[in-house]
Every structure is written in C-alpha cells, then in structure tokens.
A protein has these predicted regions:
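Extracytoplasmic/periplasmic substrate-recognition and gating elements
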Residues: 324-392
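Short, solvent-exposed loop/beta-turn-alpha elements that line the ligand-binding surface or hinge
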Residues: 147-159, 205-208, 228, 254-274, ...
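Extracytoplasmic/periplasmic solute-binding protein
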Residues: 169-180, 185, 195, 212-264
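Glycine-centered hinge/linker elements that transmit conformational signals in sensory
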Residues: 220, 260-293
C-alpha cells in the first residue's frame, strides 16, 4: 500500500479521534481495561521464578520459517510475560528466532501513538484490537491486510471463518482474533455472603437453567432486603458494557454486521426496547446503583458483601482470586449475565481479542506467525495445557474459576451475539456508551440525567445512523 495514501488516511481523522478519546466516560467511574490512560515506557521484567514456562517438548505449525526479527508491539500489557500469552511468545521466540519489544500504553493513548508512529514511518508490528478498531481505524488505512500471510483453512482457525469474515473491510481480512469470549463480562458476587444470607447461589440457578432477568432482579431484592440497616446495594460495575450484555441477551445486537459486510442498526428494535425497559426498572427500583464514592472497578463492595453484583470484565477476576489466596474465608464467584426469558435461546454477548498489524510494518509475516502461535495456545492440546499452567500461576484462579470461565471460550457451544456498537468514531461511540450507562444507572450525566432510553435514543439516532451510512458508503464505493 502506498505510504502517502496510508499517511493521508491516518491524518484525515487523527485530530478529531484523538481529542474525542480524552472525553469523560460518564459511567460512574472508569474501566481500567477499556479507558485507561496509564502508560509505561517499555516492557516489564518477567520473573521466571514465579511463572517458569517451558515449551521445549511442544511442536506446532504456526507457519513457515521467517527471518529472525525484533518486532515492536504497542498496547495495554506486556505480551511477553502475561500468563495467557507467555507460552505462545516463548514458542515464537525459541522456534522462529524472533523477539518482541513491548511499548505499554493506556488504551486511550493507542490511537495517538499509532498515528504518530505511522506518520513518522516507524510503524510497530503488532497492536491491540480495541473498541475503535472496526470500522473506524480500518477505514483510515491504519492496518495491513493479512490475507497473504494467514490460512483460514488451518486447523487452529476451524469453525471461525464466520466470525473473522465479519471484520472484513472491503473484501480484505485485517483481523484474526485469537481469543473468543462468549461471556467477556460477568456478574461477580460474594458466594460466601450469599450463603450466609440464605440466598440461592446464582451459579446453581445458571446450571439449572433458571438464571433469567427476573431471577437476577429477585436475588438482588432479597440481598438488599437482608440488611435492616439499608447498607446493601444491588448491581454496580462497567455501566455501558453491563447494559450491552443485557441487550444482547435478547439475541439482537445494537449494531450488527450483515452478510454483505455492512452495518445494521437495531436501536429501534422491539427486543432492544424491551431490554431497555427492564434496565430502567432496575434503576428506578434501586436494584442497579453505585454506592457513594464507589467506581466501577472498586472491589471492596464485593469483598465486604455490601453489593450483590459487580458487572465487570473477566480481567478483574484474577484480583479476587489473589485475595482469596490470602484470605481462605473469601468465596468469590461469577455468572454470565442472565437469560432473557422471552428469547428463544440463551444468547451471550461475544467479544474477541487479538492483534492487528499496523500499516507500514516491516514484519507482517513474522507478526502473522505470532498471531498463529497465540491462537494455537487455545487449540493445540500440548500448548493449551502449558498455557493453562501459566495462567494458573500468573492469575491464581481456583480450578473451579478457571474451568467455568474458560468454558465460555468454546464459542460453538453457545449462541453468540456479535455486537460492535462503539467503533463508529470516538464521539459517537461515547454517545452510545452514555446512553447505555444512563439507561441502567442514575449516573447524573449532565446531558442525559432524568431522560428515558427513548428520549436519549431519539435525540441521538440521527447522529448514529449518519455514521453507519458513512461507513456503509465507504464499503459500497470501495475504500481502497
């Protein structure tokens, strides 16, 4: 791809995108795995004593031999030491002669850093997938298509083409997710406190097929009513993502990707309206509420047993697992967001994760081999077993926590809903996040305080639809 064209596409949207990325989330706090601006300059130091990983006896086919190289990674974490990636990296390093140098930045800094690097002709070779990747950053020519380097017929990608192809941009594949999470956001609860109160265990309700919207609301009511002093609250957490999970449980995503690759809005869908009505009832009844001074990532309300549920990404479960290691009286567990009892199936809000190769990368072939290694850590039995050992040492999960959490990565066992509502552009994405968060929680947002779902939607549907039409127009006209 012509470098001047890459640069023009990147710079065309860089200013507005970067400024919008600094806007407040309005979600009652911040979500450290989605909105962080924290940064460190280089890779962290791995402690082989705490998490030694050996891949010497493993043999996988991640691609043909490549020239040894040092790849540059730009993203949220050290992919050479993280428990779930370290075995893949060690195999890549030892068998393909490649190293990866990590520059770790907050997620809100990735776009700015990537834009600057591409503009200077210093593109990194790997970058995290983020909310703004599709379609925003793809439309700006910020990535390298990987069709020439990846083989969808390879065993590790079996059964995934329907998901990978959803992220095509004008007929080209840029994104091959190596991680698939059917339930990437969970409802975390203090199982020990539930037992003390005499409440039914949500995990048991889930196992029995009884975990529905109504069951969750009933459990929260009983939890709150169990405290005569009125100090217990219901649901808190990642406000917009919790709301999205409830909507997706109807089987209808807010924004879906059609078979023709175009975006389809379902903001006016009757099932989405019904989910919004349910969320507003949770808010009005006080079942979804932040405690005074609490933000969405705070763990004390769950540990102390003063909140029923925290809706949060799986990343936070390791924090609770480590607390349980230090205090064996703690029993923290989690369940998926509940089923919509009016839906024909139990639908789960699916997310994906992986790396893309930025435009201008000099080592796209090597980067593709590494992506294959990461995917094989989920499919090759030997590498998968080594990866589990690494994760357990690194994240301190109990066997029960690990087994339940990782069961949701077998996506063909579930009815997965692919929903991409935040990637239109940073401004519109934030509008959608604000609408969702303020539907489920009383966030006292200056713009939306006191407004209903319908009022917020109608005030913004024109902006949302305009952006959808813009991207669909690019696909029609051939943005290449």
């Amino acid at each position: 791809m012509n470098f001047k064209r890459i640069l023009a596409g990147v710079m065309a949207g860089a200013t507005s995108i970067s400024l919008a990325a600094c806007s407040n989330s309005g979600n009652g706090g911040f979500d450290s795995d989605t909105n962080s601006t924290a940064s460190s300059s280089e890779t962290t130091i791995d402690d082989e004593i705490d998490n030694p990983v050996s891949v010497g006896d493993i043999s996988i086919d991640a691609g043909e031999d490549v020239e040894p190289a040092e790849l540059e990674y730009l993203g949220n974490y050290d992919i050479t030491t993280a428990g779930d990636v370290k075995p893949a990296y060690k195999y890549f390093s030892e068998n393909y002669g490649c190293k990866i140098k990590c520059t770790i930045v907050g997620s809100l800094q990735i776009l700015e850093k990537l834009t600057t690097a591409i503009s200077a002709g210093e593109s990194p070779d790997l970058v995290d997938y983020s909310d703004s990747t599709f379609p925003l950053m793809m439309s700006k020519n910020m990535y390298t298509p990987l069709d020439d380097y990846m083989d969808l017929s390879a065993p590790q990608w079996s059964g995934l083409d329907q998901y990978i192809n959803k992220y095509k941009w004008n007929g080209k594949n840029y994104y091959y997710p190596w991680a698939y999470n059917v339930s990437s956001y969970f409802l975390i609860y203090n199982r020990g406190v539930f037992e003390q109160i005499g409440l039914e265990d949500p995990k048991e309700l889930y196992d029995e097929g009884k975990w529905t919207w109504e069951a969750m609301a009933d459990v929260i009511r009983k939890f709150i009513d169990s405290d005569t002093d009125g100090n217990r609250t219901g649901l808190y957490g990642a406000s917009e993502y919790s709301a999205q999970a409830i909507i997706d449980s109807t089987g209808v995503p807010l924004i879906e990707i059609g078979e023709d690759g175009k975006l389809v809005s379902n903001f006016n869908n009757a099932s989405v309206d019904r989910a919004a009505t349910f969320m507003q009832s949770l808010k009005s009844e006080g079942l979804a509420k932040f405690q005074e001074g609490v933000i969405n990532v705070d763990e004390d309300p769950i540990v102390s047993g003063t909140a029923a549920f925290q809706g949060m990404g799986e990343w936070i479960i390791t924090n609770y697992a480590k607390k349980m290691k230090k205090d064996d009286s703690l029993d923290i567990f989690f369940v998926p967001f509940p089923r919509d009892s009016q839906a024909d199936e139990y639908y789960y809000s699916m997310t994906t994760f992986g790396y893309l190769v930025p435009a201008g990368s000099k080592f796209a072939k090597q980067a593709s081999v590494f992506i294959n290694c990461c995917r094989l850590s989920n499919t090759d039995e030997d590498l998968k077993a080594t990866t589990k050992e690494s994760i357990m040492r690194n994240k301190k999960y109990t066997d029960e926590q690990y087994d339940f959490m990782y069961s949701f990565k077998e996506i063909n066992n579930f009815h997965a809903v692919v929903d991409e509502p935040y990637g239109l552009d940073e401004t519109t994405g934030q509008i959608i996040k604000d609408i969702l968060g303020n539907t489920l929680f009383d966030l006292q947002n200056e713009t939306y305080a006191g407004q209903s779902w319908t009022q917020m939607r109608e005030a913004n549907i024109g902006t949302i639809n305009k952006q959808i039409e813009y991207y669909n127009g690019l696909i029609t006209s051939g943005n290449s």
